Regions:
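Mature N-terminal, pre-catalytic/accessory segment of carbohydrate-active enzymes
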Residues: 1-52, 56-88, 374, 631, ...
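Short, acidic/polar
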Residues: 20-36, 134-145, 242-253, 316-324, ...
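Short acidic/polar active-site loop segments enriched in Thr and Asp
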Residues: 39-41, 152, 333-334, 433
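Glycine-rich, aromatic-flanked loop segments that form ligand/cofactor-binding clefts
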Residues: 12, 39-44, 70-119, 153-158, ...
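Carbohydrate-binding surfaces of carbohydrate-active enzymes
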Residues: 2, 7-9, 85, 199-200, ...
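Short, solvent-exposed turn/loop segments enriched in Gly/Ser/Thr/Pro and often Arg
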Residues: 16, 43-50, 89-96, 155-167, ...
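Aromatic-lined carbohydrate-binding/catalytic grooves of carbohydrate-active enzymes
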Residues: 30, 35-70, 93-111, 163-175, ...
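Active-site-adjacent "subsite" loops/lids of carbohydrate-active enzymes
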Residues: 87, 91-149, 158, 174-207, ...
Length: 719
């Protein structure tokens, strides 16, 4: 690591300084208020389209600055309170005066016309990441900052990495044309067209260019000061629009960054009379994924305000606290994006209570947030190639399949890691009992071979829908690459309701083996709803159990004619195999993961969870008897097991008041090298009775209001 402070979890705020804030900015009061909020890291925009210090460079300084060196004032004040100062910059926008001097720095459309940032701004152009503005000129900006201020880090805004900013499309400037020609031997595509095979090649170039861009920025900072940490701002797959248009591969980018920051800002995006809510578990998703694929310090940025569009109003404290707590429950650190001025002058100060409460809790108990690692033995796989090249017209469906798994496991309290398909190697898979493939369609032969060997060595695999049916470039194969492993061959992909004929229809999964463990706790029913598409498959080999088959579809209306006399066609919808090694495989021919996220019928979540429990042979490290709205994660330290409890039961969002979770039972399964001797909650440190169970120890927690951590402390000789 580049600096000692990166070795510990942080409690951050990011401040976007507006022009008008410079008029009466009180740096000393800012530092004091942040200290009172238990903040130990502040990043703040100081250079770019708004610069808040005197400069000899062609940067736009705030008209309200009045000759002040606000950057210097902030850094000095922060250090007086022991807060780290990270200077952030965003050179994605070029002021008109600078663009006039260097028109070659602008990003161009196919007609050679420059892209303008939001036209109402009027005098800003969008910079190409390959241009001199974000390269040679950036070096001068950086040199000025590093030589002048005692900074603890440099952070580059999101516009510094990706190839889209403020709505621009493909850049046709000379540097982009030359770079793409050298990469592919082709000219740039004429338009964005996900169905065009050439688009895939273009996206691969952009992905490589973004990684190279990340490497360049890292080296640039280190050339100025080898010990100065570099932070980024990007996003994981949970925002597919930004990920795809920006060609962002955060896993590879993280290799060239000291501290990785990704965003989970959006709560609900309101546009006119329409509103779209973001996934409530998005904070967990991002922290979980990045801590699984990177050994860098992980920051996840969430808005203080109600994004989007209300930058001035705070997220209600009840929701904010449990939203931010998810970062810490999954190994990350929270950084709150503050817009609208420093805390003392903010128009809505109601949200600061949540930050003070959570950050104070983390600070008081910081030893339990250091040196921890995930205790999960189930891995859910994300595939960058599947997002980019599989369902190109609706990539959100793939993300929703992953999130359906996340939602099911969260509701049933199954600890899991989100890993990349690049981790499908013997070394990385060794720590997992079960690997889950939610429609991991684009799969390499190397990954498939690793999974086969994994099962041969006793591991288990759960897969859904078109997993392994496509190559890494999105070309459809004749059969599943995992056909032998899963025991099925692909025949066709169809709607569960059959061909479209104008009749509103329904279809079901018929229960065929009601006593199979995969159908445990299903209750007194012989049918389960079937939704979306499915793969018609043929069984391969013997010794496969088929607990569910697809019914014939039939009409919904009129009710008196809503039935079918057609026989069950017998298409397998759930296929389970036990392998000689002791490993198990489960294949869902349909899309229960996607359906569970979008429509929420509980049977789908139960089936997915049963699949993991059965595949894992009952060897999950933790079991919880708790409401489905209590998020439970497991972290490990050398002599502790840490069960993070995040209560997400606040009724209708945005949460105004949390409904406490009560009478929770946590069973920690026995480990050969760890013997619990004491259990307590970090909120009060009072010891809780340990009850010996057949395969571990259990504890009862009477109440969780919003966020707490249950600590199992081991014997002194536990290792």
């Amino acid at each position: 690591m580049a600096s000692e402070w990166l070795r510990t979890r942080g409690r951050g705020v990011h401040l976007t300084i507006r022009d008008v804030d410079c008029r009466d900015f009180d740096a000393e009061r800012l530092a004091k208020d942040l200290h009172d909020l238990h903040v130990n890291v502040l990043s703040f925009f100081c250079a770019g389209y708004i610069t808040v210090h005197p400069t000899s460079l062609s940067l736009r300084t705030s008209p309200f600055l009045g000759g002040r060196d606000l950057t210097g004032e902030i850094v000095a004040a922060l250090h007086r309170y022991g807060i780290k100062a990270v200077a952030a910059m965003d050179l994605s926008l070029i002021p008109e005066t600078v663009a006039g001097e260097h028109p070659e720095w602008r990003s161009l459309d196919a007609r050679g016309e420059p892209y303008r940032a939001n036209r109402d701004l009027g005098n800003f152009y969008i910079a190409c990441p390959l241009s001199g503005y974000q390269n040679e000129f950036l070096e001068q900006v950086l040199r000025e900052l590093v030589s002048r201020y005692d900074l603890d880090g440099i952070k580059f805004g999101g516009g510094s990495y990706g190839f889209t900013s403020y709505g621009n499309g493909i850049c046709y400037c000379s540097r982009c044309r030359e770079a793409y020609r050298a990469f592919s031997g082709r000219e740039l595509p004429g338009r964005e067209d996900a169905s065009d095979p050439a688009w895939g090649a273009f996206q691969r170039w952009r992905r490589e260019a973004v990684v190279e861009r990340t490497r360049f920025l890292y080296r640039l900072v280190k050339s100025q000061n080898p010990d100065l940490p570099v932070m980024c701002n990007s996003v994981c797959f949970g925002d597919p629009g930004w990920t795809l248009r920006g060609a962002l591969d955060i896993e590879r980018m993280a290799e060239h960054i000291d501290a990785v920051q990704v965003e989970a800002q959006t709560r609900v995006r309101v546009d006119g009379d329409r509103g779209e809510w973001q996934f409530l578990l998005w904070p967990s998703e991002e922290a979980n994924f990045l801590t699984s694929v990177s050994n860098r310090q992980i920051w996840v940025l969430a808005s203080y305000f109600q994004a989007w569009p209300w930058r001035r109003n705070a997220v209600p404290p009840a929701e904010q606290k449990v939203y931010l707590a998810q970062f810490y429950a999954n190994g990350g650190s929270a950084i709150v994006n503050l817009s609208g001025g420093p805390p003392a002058v903010h128009q809505d100060r109601r949200g600061f209570a949540a930050i003070r409460s959570l950050y104070g809790f983390v600070e008081r108990n910081r030893s339990y947030y250091e040196g921890d690692a995930s205790g999960a033995n189930v891995a859910v796989v994300y595939s960058q190639n599947t997002l980019f090249y599989y369902d190109r017209e609706q990539p959100g469906r793939y993300v929703d399949a992953i999130r359906g798994m996340e939602q099911a496991f969260a509701e049933h309290h199954v600890p899991f890691d989100l890993i990349s398909d690049t981790r499908l190697t013997a070394e990385h898979l060794a720590k997992y009992r079960t690997v889950v493939l939610p429609c991991t369609a684009c799969m390499t032969e190397e990954a498939a071979e690793s999974l086969k060997k994994y099962v041969e060595n006793g591991g288990s695999v759960v897969a859904t829908f078109e997993t392994s049916l496509y190559d890494p470039d999105g070309r459809k194969r004749d059969d599943f690459l995992l056909a032998d492993l899963l025991g099925v061959s692909h025949a066709d992909t169809l709607q569960v309701t059959g061909r479209e004929d104008g009749v509103y229809k329904q279809a079901y999964l018929n229960v065929r083996l009601g006593d199979h463990p995969l159908l445990s706790d299903l209750g007194d029913t012989t049918v389960i709803p079937a939704a979306n598409r499915y793969c018609r498959v043929r069984l391969r080999g013997e010794k496969a159990a088929v607990p569910l088959t697809l019914s014939a579809a039939f009409r919904v209306f009129p009710e008196g004619m809503s039935y079918t006399l057609e026989p069950d066609p017998g298409d397998p919808m759930l296929v389970a195999r036990e392998h000689p090694s002791g490993g198990r495989t489960v294949y869902f021919a349909g899309q229960p993961d996607l359906a569970f996220l979008r429509f929420g019928y509980p049977d789908w979540g139960l089936l997915l969870t049963n699949a993991v429990r059965w595949a894992s042979g009952g060897r999950l490290p933790l079991e919880a008897e708790a409401p489905p709205t209590l998020l439970v994660t497991l972290r490990k330290q050398e002599n502790c097991r840490l069960v993070h409890l995040v209560n997400l039961n606040g009724g209708r969002r945005m949460f105004r008041q949390m409904i406490p979770a009560r009478d929770i039972k946590i069973l920690l399964r026995s480990e050969p090298a760890f013997r619990p001797r004491r259990a307590f909650l970090l909120s009060n440190l009072h010891s809780l009775p340990l009850a010996e169970e057949k395969d571990g120890v259990s504890v009862r927690v009477s109440r969780v209001e919003d966020y707490d951590v249950l600590v199992f402390e081991g014997d002194a000789d536990s290792r």
